[in-house]
A protein has these predicted regions:
Chain A
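Glycine-rich phosphate-binding loops of nucleotide-dependent enzymes
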Residues: 1-240
């Protein structure tokens, strides 16, 4: 069964179509990468999927249920998790409490919550800073904290919006290992600029350009495709 | 009195209320529209206008007409200066943060009101109108010979009340002309549209803000000077104009001047007419609830783009 | 962490013990004042729950205080209900009014929320005046001594009154501390810190806010009902705008979002007004000056400043 099916999504901003008739289907256990040049509509598309933005047209099914009109918090409660492109955490609360807020909704009691939090922090290697205020973390650690908040919800679909943006090289390598760990039991939708990361972790890549799906295929296909290369001309992200 | 003449009287009295209210509320609308802040002390500037008008005419004791004429010019300027001072010393320092501005203007409200109580005292004092001829008004009745006019007892209005309506209309027209036609109005509208952009174009936004806050208070004070010969000056008289101005500004589409004037007419006239049928308290309850519901259910519709 | 918990226990336990012990040393006049302060601090705590912990600034809490006051007063004086039941009716009335106003007002935010709550409270005040035959309008009515028996205790007796005020204060204070440490309270704080994130973690933010309004209203109503029972008077002035401004003033002065702020704020403001009203009828001048001064120089309030400068562990 497909975890997420989006059909004919359209989003207009004052006559401009930021997302123009996008159809997308993500099967279970897949790591799907969403790439495209700046302004291609990636973040808008993810906004539609997570419910932060309303669709002008189209239909979204999640786990076989129509969620087009479902408010964002209910989508999350149904098993979506979302990490923000611009780090969005609770700065004055401790790292532990940040993850606890994410986990608590699904836990029966505080003891359960603590166990889930400890596990999530261990997976992103942040256990040693559990009692630090989130504001005092380095930028890279804050990004990892976001991911831990996503993981602690044991989501069916984890949406990661540019998770490696601003990370150091070593941190990116850690992140790739983390995705390989996550993919064991979670479907992932990954918006990513870094093509190295995409090549290493994605099963299928969707390329977005001018709000439309330009191409869809395996990482190798994408690299071979001339249209995609053209779309990226001027954006210096294609290294391979 | 028959119903017809009675209704006409209510309408005329309502028109006086509407005129004064339109002046007061347009001051509040101006401040909200351009500065995006809610001035809770607006009613106290109204009250100060009335109290200072009493003070000026009292000083001029022997010549009430001249005293009133001076008050009409000087008092709004005094109140505007005071408001400008409050803007520069308080509101500017908290960066016009919307919520903190409300708290600060609540503080200003109490300061103005209580200082008035300490100096002017708790009494209500009248101001003599400069002229006050009673004008009897005709009504028609159907007789066997067709329609004929007669002068029902009690159906009358004073020349002063008519003058208030005229003066308010004149001032509002002047305000509209300043906003639309003058360079100052252009700068104000630019500041209203986009503060950052206005700054970039070299418009002295801070001075515009101080001026607008002063003008807003000055309009309230002017309305109060006009109304004080009809209604006495008292240190607690600011509450009602504040509440009514809120209602008018919200119905009129926050910050829009023509909308505010229209809403003031609607509220002022219906206030006079409704109180013929309902108790004034019930009318106030309904108006308050109506406005709250408007804010709750039609925020975009009323304000254009969501401003509050 | 553990040492902070100990310090907290020591400080708050100390404050409660001191409040309890005060009654044995205070002269009669101040004895009555402190009882009044504890009831008003309960009102302030109800306000702080919403303003300090959810960042919702209401300008209409008097309607909740009055709902408790009149709910109790009418039940006890007109319907012949016993005082304890009257108290419960008062709290329930506050909760219901809170649910209705909350459900409507929460559709707005920021300045519109402030104005909508102000308008609803004004309507509430006018409604009390309109039904003057029952409420006696501005004049208000006295609750007879026979109606002020609480399980045999005569609430008009100063010492029993002090105990009652102290009990209500303690229960409210401890429930708020417990609430803040519960998952519910932690979620409220998360919503205050970053509402958008809380939504994207699957929380129904509106529901949490509505519950917070209802709790806040019920606590304010508890204070109102207690005030009526302890001091034997129910009047419309308690529903006026001034009584919506007071809790804002107290909480701003004491420190929004601090546990002890409401008590500290009420204490200082009460005595400031008490002293100045001995000197002039224009005693509300003090309130105005304090409001302006706080927004300009100390937006965090007394306890907030203490927390910022000295005791970071204060809740």
């Amino acid at each position: 069964m497909s975890v997420l099916v989006a059909k004919g999504l359209i989003r207009q901003f004052n006559g401009l179509r930021a997302v123009d008739n996008v159809t997308l289907e993500i099967p279970e256990q897949q790591v799907r990468a969403l790439i495209g040049p700046n302004g291609a509509g990636k973040t808008t598309l993810v906004g539609l999927l997570s419910g932060r933005l309303a669709c002008s047209n189209g239909r979204i099914d999640f786990l076989g249920r129509d969620i087009t009109k479902v408010p964002p918090h209910k989508r999350i409660a149904m098993g979506m998790a979302y990490t923000f492109q611009i780090t969005s955490i609770f700065p004055s609360l401790s790292v532990h409490e940040n993850v606890a807020i994410a986990a608590r909704r699904l836990c029966r009691n505080e003891k359960d919550t603590r166990a889930v939090v400890a596990d999530a922090l261990k997976r992103v290697s942040l256990a040693h800073v559990a009692n630090t205020d989130a504001a005092d973390l380095s930028y890279g650690h804050q990004r990892l904290l976001e991911i831990a908040m996503g993981l602690s919800q044991s989501p069916r679909l984890l949406i990661l919006d540019e998770p490696t943006q601003g990370l150091a090289e070593g941190e990116v390598a850690e992140f790739i290992k983390l995705i390989h760990d996550i993919r064991q039991n979670t479907t992932v939708l990954l918006i990513e600029h870094n093509m190295d990361v995409v090549m290493q972790v994605a099963d299928v890549v969707t390329v977005l350009n001018h709000g439309q799906v330009l191409f869809e295929g395996t990482p190798a296909d994408v690299q071979a495709n001339i249209e995609v290369q053209t779309a990226y001309l001027g954006g210096a992200h294609v290294k391979a | 009195m028959d119903f017809g003449p009675y209704l006409m009287l209510a309408t005329l009295e309502g028109a006086v209320t509407a005129a004064v209210l339109a002046l007061t509320a347009s001051g509040l609308a101006l401040v909200f529209g351009i500065m995006r802040v809610v001035n809770v002390a607006h009613g106290e500037f109204f009250m100060l206008g009335a109290v200072l008008a009493w003070w000026v005419t009292d000083l001029m004791g022997a010549t009430p007409v001249l005293g009133f004429a001076i008050a009409l010019v000087v008092v709004p300027l005094m109140v505007a200066a005071l408001a400008t001072f409050a803007d520069m010393t308080i509101l500017k320092r908290i960066n016009y943060d919307p919520e903190r501005t409300i708290v600060a203007t609540i503080g200003i409200l109490y300061i103005l009101q209580q200082v008035t109580l300490m100096t002017y005292g708790p009494d209500a004092r009248p101001v003599t109108a400069p002229f006050n001829t009673r004008l009897a008004l005709p009504w028609f009745e159907r007789t066997e010979d067709g329609i004929s006019l007669y002068w029902p007892w009690g159906l009358s209005i004073t020349s002063y009340k008519l003058a208030v309506i005229g003066a308010a209309g004149g001032v509002l027209l002047g305000l509209w002309a300043v906003m639309k036609r003058s360079r100052l109005g252009l700068m104000m509208r630019a500041t209203e549209q986009d503060r950052e952009m206005a700054l970039a174009f070299g418009i002295p936004v801070e001075r515009i803000y101080a001026l607008v806050f002063g003008m807003g208070a000055g309009l309230a004070a002017l309305a109060a000077v006009l109304v004080v010969p009809i209604q006495q000056a008292h240190y607690l008289m600011g509450g009602d104009p504040l509440l009514l101005s809120f209602i008018v500004v919200i119905i009129g589409g926050l910050g829009s001047l023509p909308g505010t004037v229209l809403a003031a007419l609607l509220i002022g006239l219906s206030d006079g007419i409704i109180s013929v049928f309902f108790s004034p308290t019930l009318a106030k309850i309904l108006a308050t609830l109506l406005v709250a519901m408007l804010l709750v259910f039609r925020p975009q519709g009323m304000f254009g783009e969501r401003r509050l | 962490m553990r040492r902070d918990v100990q310090k907290n226990l020591l400080l708050h336990g100390g404050v409660l013990v001191a409040l309890f012990a005060l009654q044995f040393v205070l002269p009669a006049y101040h004895h009555g004042n402190v009882a009044r302060i504890m009831v008003l601090a309960t009102y302030a705590m109800g306000y702080n729950l919403l303003f300090g912990y959810v960042d919702l600034l209401s300008l209409g809490h008097a309607v909740f205080f009055a709902a408790g006051l009149y709910g109790m007063g009418i039940a006890v004086s007109h319907l012949g209900v016993s005082a304890p039941l009257g108290l419960m009716i008062g709290v329930l009335a506050g909760g219901v009014v809170g649910a209705i106003i909350g459900a409507l007002a929460l559709r707005t935010e920021g300045v519109a929320f402030m104005i909508v709550t102000l308008m609803f409270a004004q309507a509430g005040y006018l409604i009390i005046l309109y039904f003057g035959e029952i409420t006696r309008g501005d004049e208000g009515f006295v609750i007879q001594q026979v109606d002020r028996l609480f399980f045999g205790g005569d609430l008009s007796d100063p010492f029993i009154r002090y105990y009652a005020a102290f009990t209500v204060f303690c229960i409210s204070f401890l429930s708020i501390l417990a609430l803040l440490h519960s998952p519910f309270g932690k979620t409220l704080i998360a919503i205050r810190e970053n509402q958008e994130r809380a939504v994207m973690l699957g929380y129904n933010v509106m529901r949490f806010k509505l519950l917070a309004v209802i709790f806040s209203a019920a606590l304010s109503a508890l204070a109102g009902a207690t005030y009526g029972l302890l001091f034997g008077y129910v009047g419309a002035s308690f529903a006026s705008v001034q009584y919506s401004i007071f809790p804002l003033l107290w909480v701003l002065l004491g420190g929004a979002g601090t546990a002890l702020g409401p008590l500290v704020g009420v204490f200082f403001m009460f005595y400031l007004i008490d002293i100045s009203s001995g000197m002039t009828t224009a005693y509300m001048l003090v309130a105005g000056v304090v409001l302006v001064g706080l927004t300009l120089f100390a937006p965090q309030g007394l306890m907030g400043e203490i927390r910022r400068r000295f005791w970071r562990w204060l809740p």
